Amino acid sequence: MSLFDYRVSELHSLLHKKEISVSDLVDESFKRIHEVDEKVQAFLTLNEEQARAKAKELDEKLATEKEFGLLFGMPIGIKDNIVTKGLRTTCASKILYNFDPIYDATVVERLNEADAVTVGKLNMDEFAMGSSTENSGFQLTRNPWDLERVPGGSSGGSAAAVAAGEVPFALGSDTGGSIRQPAAFCGVVGLKPTYGRVSRYGLVAFASSLDQIGPITRTVEDNAYLLQVISGLDPMDSTSANVDVPDYVSALTGDIQGLKIAVPKEYLGEGVSEEVRQSVLDALKVLEGLGATWEEVSLPHSKYALATYYLLASSEASANLARFDGVRYGYRTDHAKNLMEMYKQTRSEGFGNEVKRRIMLGTFALSSGYYDAYYKKAQKVRTLIKQDFENVFEKYDVIIGPTTPTPAFKIGEKTSDPLTMYANDILTIPVNLAGVPGISIPCGFVNGLPVGLQIIGKHFDESTIYRVAHAFEQATDYHKQKPTL
C-alpha cells in the first residue's frame, strides 16, 4: 500500500504521531516517479535534490514543533506554466526551454509557507493551448488508465501524476476546462475556482480574463485542503478578489438534503456519448437518494460558447504572447540578419503549430475592420452566457452534467482536426466564460476508462460544490479505483 493511498488528514496524523517522516513522503514520491514516469511522462523537470534537502529541514522542525499545517511535508507537483524560483519553467514550449524564473508565483509562495514540498514541474499543452497534452514541445504524457490514450489537457501532466500515484497533489490551470477535463479523463478530482478566488500572479498568461489556478487531487477532502491554502486576496494581482475564504473542509458534512440541482438539457444532448449520459443519470440517482432533487433546465446560449471562447481566448493570447520575442529571455534564433528578422524567426521556430494558429486567429479577430464583427460580438455573447447561469442560480443551488462528452480518446485520434479537438471542451468552456466555479469528480467507468461528473456553483460558492461532491464521493467508490501501471 502506497502512502499516497491515505488522505492528507491521515498522513498529517501519521506525521504528528511520528510514525512517518517528511523524508518518507518525499522518498515515496520520487520512488514512484522513477518507477512509472518513463511510461506516463508526466514530469518535465524534477526538483529532487532541493526537495530532499527541504524534507530533512522539515523533519528537524517536526522533531521540535507540536503544531503544523495540514500540507506540512506533503509532496506536490506544479504545472509548468506556474513560475518557480530557481526551478525551470517552460510552459512546455521550446521558446522557454531555458527559462529560470527569479521569483515564485503567489500560489507557490503560499505552498512554501505551508511547508509543502515541490517535487517537480508537470507537462502540459504548450502555453496551456490544447485538450490532450499532445501539444507539448517536449514529450507526450500518457493516460495512466490506458497508455495509448491522452490524459486530457492542458493540465494533462498534473492529472496523470496524481492518477499514477506520483504525488498526492498537483496544481493546474484552467482557461476553458484545462483542470476539469484531464481530471475527468484520469479519474481524479479537479476544481476550477471562481475567477479571482486564487491569485494569477506568476501564472504565465494565456487568456487573462479566463485563466485560473486550481487543485488536482485524489479526493474531494484533499482538494478542499489545497484550495484553502492557495486562495485569498493578493495585492500583486489586480483581478484577485477581496472576498473572505471560508473553511472549505467544514462544508464537507455529507448533508445535501433539500439541495436543488439543475441539469441543462444542452449538457446531455447531441455529441455526448450514451455511456457518459447514463453515468451522469446514475450519479443523479445517487444524489436523489441522499435527499437532493433535480430538474432539467436550459442554458440557451451554450451553443455559442465554443466560438465565443476561441475568439476571446485567442485574442487575449495574441496580446499576451507578444512578449516572447527572443530579447529578454528564452529561445533566440541564430539565423537572423537584423532585429525584425530575429523577432519573426524566433517566434516561428520557438512556438508550436497550435500556438501559432491561435495567435493568428486572435490577431485577425482584433484587426481593424474585424474587431466589431468578431471580438466585440463575442464579448456580448459572453455576457449572455453569464446571464444564463445567473438565471438558473436564482432557483437552483448547483448545476450538474458531464465534464466531457466522451472518455479519453486515443493518442493521435484528433490531432489532424482542430475543430474536433476544440469540441472536447464544449461542456467546460461556459464555466470559464461565466467566471463561476466548477469541479470534476469520478462518477463511473466506460470500458475501463473514467467518466467525470461536473458540478458547477455560484460565484465564490466553492463550499456548496465541495459539499455535493463529497456527499457523492462518500456514497460511491469510484475515487478509490486506481490504474494498474
UniProtKB/Swiss-Prot annotation:
Keyword flag tRNA processing: no
Family per similarity comment: Belongs to the amidase family. GatA subfamily.
Gene3D superfamilies xref list: Amidase signature (AS) domain
Keywords: ATP-binding, Ligase, Nucleotide-binding, Protein biosynthesis
Lineage: Bacteria, Bacillati, Bacillota, Bacilli, Bacillales
GO terms classed as biological process: translation
Matches recorded under PROSITE patterns: AMIDASES
Disulfide bonds: none
NCBIfam families: gatA
Subunit structure as annotated in this protein's UniProt entry: Heterotrimer of A, B and C subunits.
Catalytic activity annotation: L-glutamyl-tRNA(Gln) + L-glutamine + ATP + H2O = L-glutaminyl-tRNA(Gln) + L-glutamate + ADP + phosphate + H(+)
Cited function: Allows the formation of correctly charged Gln-tRNA(Gln) through the transamidation of misacylated Glu-tRNA(Gln) in organisms which lack glutaminyl-tRNA synthetase. The reaction takes place in the presence of glutamine and ATP through an activated gamma-phospho-Glu-tRNA(Gln).
Enzyme class: ligase
E.C. no: 6.3.5.7
Positions annotated as active site in the UniProt record: 79 (charge relay system), 154 (charge relay system), 178 (acyl-ester intermediate)
Gene Ontology terms, MF aspect: ATP binding; glutaminyl-tRNA synthase (glutamine-hydrolyzing) activity
Family annotation (Pfam families): Amidase
This protein's record includes keyword Cytoplasm: no
UniProt name for this protein: Glutamyl-tRNA(Gln) amidotransferase subunit A
Cellular component terms (Gene Ontology): glutamyl-tRNA(Gln) amidotransferase complex
InterPro entries: Amidase (IPR000120), Amidase_CS (IPR020556), Amidase_dom (IPR023631), AS_sf (IPR036928), GatA (IPR004412)
